[in-house]
């Protein structure tokens, strides 16, 4: 080892930082088998996320991993990296030699002298992709690209004319990308690319597929068995190396023993001091990395009983999103509509409140559904008047939804009081439910006192050319205003993000909330998210806090806000779009949904905390699309204003059950939008925000509700559906089957979206041979010679659970 001792006098966080650069390979630098680097009270309690290397260089901000980075003493960096250190930002910039860099590697951080943390590093998978456009002799001033490659922002990617053609080369991760060419401002399909696909809105996009993916050549991992303090991991395919972390500590030497394709992991005795800790496992070979495993421990034993899981185990959440004003009116004493004749009834207050939510908690509605996390829409004070304008039919709007704050700490009197919120949280906690709050950080309303006191704290309403900077979602995503009366806060500036993060923290320190859903995440500078998360980790240490964001855009953009120091997750709208298309439309194949899901896993991990939704307040209701009452090629908002939107064909209820079955059986956090448990119809905003219906459900609505209750119960009580691996068994145009296994718990999920009875036939994975399964939804099934057959009716599903 060469030890470089460097003092950084400019650094305000660290007096000294030592970089220890390994000349030998990292594999030769094995930590002590006794895990001597584990502290009794670790400086970091959370699982530290992997460092995802980007193109040429990657910036690693130390406070992302160590909120109090004064404790960091030294860092061990493998010799296939070059590095630089910035004392001003307390960050390291890594430059990797991709020729020698394995798919996965480890960087070690030493804290307080001898306390060690091992950070996983994932190699960049980006590949160069060339795009060209031939003007064919025509006069062309500009050629741009817009698509999933750049979040549909044509100004982000311009092609250069070389005298013959326009061209550019982009670095893209493996996957499928929709895009269009923008020529002289006109959007069109790429004339040089014959590949195109439906865009889900009645049109088409060009498609580019990046990378020669060989998923069958990658290693696959499954947690096979556990006995006392031994965990047995089976690997399928060639494994060049396996990486096992307990918490944030690499296990090597006697902790890992290989016997053919099975790895025996001895759990460290340090785990005895923890009521909950985790084993994380990855493997790789020359073709890339495997799926990852997450294994919860209780003491020095693997958790196998779902009864031992708690609401603090984030991966076991089943979330329910309700709009407070539209859920239940618990008391009419606080009812107050906006008295303005220009507001049509749909856009005014309906009277729902916090007392109404608490009543439904006490009544057992959420318990009967199986929900363990309630997501409340924003509850801060909103304006008393009418704002905005919709042209046809002409109407203004109230702030019934809660997204127009005129205060950041005061509860809107139309929703209730501080005491009402505390009672709601207490009642939820007493029933083992979390409560997370929808928090609006991006903007305030013009009536907010802050705007009058500090108008300079906002971005400009006007662009340099004099045009309005409103609804420029992608082109000016960090500065755009949502409307002329909603100033965007300039949250990259310390004088703005410091008080604003304190305000967000207020809700966690004054109420026992369990987390946030963050509105408009991609429109907020990362400085805000880093500072907020740092404050939460330093000041809210008595409970687990879950932060989930909202970003519409590419997976790369979504992922940029996730990780240690940022958010736990975001909602995966790319999967939502694919699942809506797959389950509501006959011409979108399951194979495309499966490919999209695997692509999400490659960005967010196979044991992610992403939100997988049945719908939300910004989309037309799924059931109305599935039944044909709402068309994919129409303006769903206009449709909701101009006609009564119903369900349409009753097959939509079966399709809704399939969508809920999908969300509740894949990795991630399944999220039910209120009313989707029985099939509430509607167009887009505000028609998708009708008053919740608890009584007088039709027979088919009751059957749908019963199916969803059963699905949630299966999710909550099947370890494989919370922590199991994911393996695709069949995916074609109308048939889909996948399996999840966690030790002795296995689940097989099968779909038939055709209009006729089908026998779905597929092969059982070798490691599941010998397990006995039972059909939970009444379909006939059989297994003979490793071949599974499940008989399914049209638009139906089945879940087989190992006995």
Located regions from the model:
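C-terminal motif of bacterial Sec signal peptides marking the signal peptidase cleavage site
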Residues: 27-28
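Solvent-exposed, low-complexity, repeat-rich "mucin-like" stalks and linkers
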Residues: 34-79, 220-237
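Active-site-proximal helices and loops of the catalytic beta/alpha 8
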Residues: 44, 49, 58, 503-505, ...
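Aromatic-rich carbohydrate-binding modules that target alpha-glucans
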Residues: 120-174, 184-211, 243-265
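C-terminal beta-strand-rich structural cap/linker in extracellular carbohydrate-active enzymes
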Residues: 178-179, 784-803
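Substrate-binding/active-site clefts of carbohydrate-active enzymes
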Residues: 313, 317, 325-511, 531-541, ...
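Loop/helix patches that line or flank the sugar-binding groove of alpha-linked glycan CAZymes
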Residues: 314, 330-349, 601-769, 792, ...
């Amino acid at each position: 080892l060469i030890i470089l001792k460097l003092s950084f006098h400019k650094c305000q966080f660290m007096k000294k930082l030592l970089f220890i650069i390994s000349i030998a390979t990292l594999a030769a630098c094995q930590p002590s088998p006794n895990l001597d680097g584990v502290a009794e009270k670790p400086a970091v309690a959370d699982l530290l996320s992997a460092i995802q290397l980007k193109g040429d260089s990657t910036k690693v901000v130390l406070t992302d991993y160590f909120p109090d980075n004064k404790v960091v003493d030294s860092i061990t960096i493998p010799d296939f990296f070059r590095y630089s250190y910035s004392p001003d930002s307390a960050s390291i910039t890594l430059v990797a030699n991709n020729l020698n860099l394995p798919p996965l590697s480890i960087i070690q951080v030493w804290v307080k002298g001898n306390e060690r943390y091992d950070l996983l590093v994932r190699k960049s998978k980006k590949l160069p992709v060339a795009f060209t456009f031939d003007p064919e002799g025509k006069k062309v001033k500009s050629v741009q690209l817009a698509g999933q490659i750049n979040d549909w922002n044509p100004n982000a990617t311009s092609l250069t004319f070389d005298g013959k053609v326009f061209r550019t080369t982009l670095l893209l991760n493996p996957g499928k990308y929709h895009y269009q060419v923008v020529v002289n401002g006109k959007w069109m399909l790429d004339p040089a690319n014959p590949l195109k696909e439906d865009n889900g809105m009645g049109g088409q996009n060009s498609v580019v597929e990046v990378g020669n993916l060989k998923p069958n050549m990658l290693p696959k991992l499954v947690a096979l068995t556990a006995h006392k303090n031994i965990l047995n991991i089976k690997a399928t395919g060639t494994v060049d190396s396996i990486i096992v972390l307990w918490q944030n500590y690499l296990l090597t030497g006697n902790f890992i023993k290989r016997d053919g394709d099975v790895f025996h992991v001895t759990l460290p005795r340090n785990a005895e001091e923890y009521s909950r800790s985790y084993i994380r496992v990855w493997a790789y070979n020359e073709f890339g990395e495997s799926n990852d495993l997450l294994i919860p421990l209780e003491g020095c034993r693997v958790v196998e009983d779902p009864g031992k899981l708690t609401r603090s185990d984030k991966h076991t959440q089943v979330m329910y999103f309700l709009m407070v004003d539209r859920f239940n009116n618990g008391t009419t004493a606080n009812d107050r509509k906006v008295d303005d004749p220009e507001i049509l009834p749909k856009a005014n207050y309906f009277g729902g409140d916090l007392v109404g939510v608490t009543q439904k908690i006490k009544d057992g509605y959420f318990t009967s559904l199986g929900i363990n996390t309630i997501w409340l829409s924003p509850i801060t004070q909103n304006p008393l008047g009418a704002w905005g304008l919709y042209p046809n039919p002409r109407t203004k709007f109230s702030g019934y939804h809660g997204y127009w704050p005129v205060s950041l700490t005061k509860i809107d009197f139309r929703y209730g009081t501080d005491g009402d919120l505390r009672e709601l949280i207490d009642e939820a906690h007493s029933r083992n439910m979390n409560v997370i709050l929808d928090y609006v950080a991006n903007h305030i309303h013009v009536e907010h006192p802050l705007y009058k006191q500090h108008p300079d704290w906002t971005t400009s309403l006007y662009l340099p050319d004099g045009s309005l900077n409103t609804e420029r979602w992608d082109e000016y995503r960090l500065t755009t205003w949502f409307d002329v009366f909603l100033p965007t806060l300039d949250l990259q500036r310390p004088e703005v993000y410091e008080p604003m993060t304190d305000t967000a923290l207020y809700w966690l320190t004054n109420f026992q909330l369990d987390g946030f859903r963050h509105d408009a995440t991609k429109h907020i500078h990362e400085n805000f998210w880093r500072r907020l998360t740092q404050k939460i980790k330093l000041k809210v240490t008595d409970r687990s806090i879950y932060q989930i964001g909202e970003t519409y855009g590419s997976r790369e953009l979504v992922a940029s806000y996730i990780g240690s120091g940022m958010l736990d997750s975001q909602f995966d709208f790319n999967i939502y779009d694919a699942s809506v298309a797959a389950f509501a439309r006959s011409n979108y194949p399951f194979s495309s949904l499966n490919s999209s899901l695997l692509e999400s896993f490659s960005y967010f991990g196979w044991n992610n905390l992403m939100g997988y939704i049945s719908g939300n307040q910004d989309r037309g209701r799924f059931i109305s699309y599935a039944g044909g009452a709402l068309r994919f090629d129409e303006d769903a908002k206009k449709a909701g204003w101009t006609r009564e939107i119903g369900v349409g064909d009753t097959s939509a209820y079966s399709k809704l059950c399939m969508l809920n079955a999908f969300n509740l059986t894949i990795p991630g956090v399944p999220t039910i939008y209120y009313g989707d448990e029985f099939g509430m119809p509607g167009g887009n905003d505000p028609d998708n925000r009708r008053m919740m219906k608890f009584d007088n459900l039709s027979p088919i609505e009751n059957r749908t509700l019963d199916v969803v209750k059963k699905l949630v119960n299966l999710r909550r009580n099947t370890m494989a559906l919370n922590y199991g691996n994911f393996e695709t068994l069949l995916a074609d145009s109308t048939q889909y089957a996948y399996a999840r296994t966690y030790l002795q718990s296995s689940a097989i999920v099968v779909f038939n979206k055709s209009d006729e009875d089908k026998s779905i036939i597929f092969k059982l994975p070798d490691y599941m041979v010998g397990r006995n399964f039972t059909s939970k939804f009444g379909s006939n099934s059989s297994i003979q010679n490793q071949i599974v057959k499940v008989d399914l009716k049209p638009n139906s599903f089945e879940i087989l659970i190992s006995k």
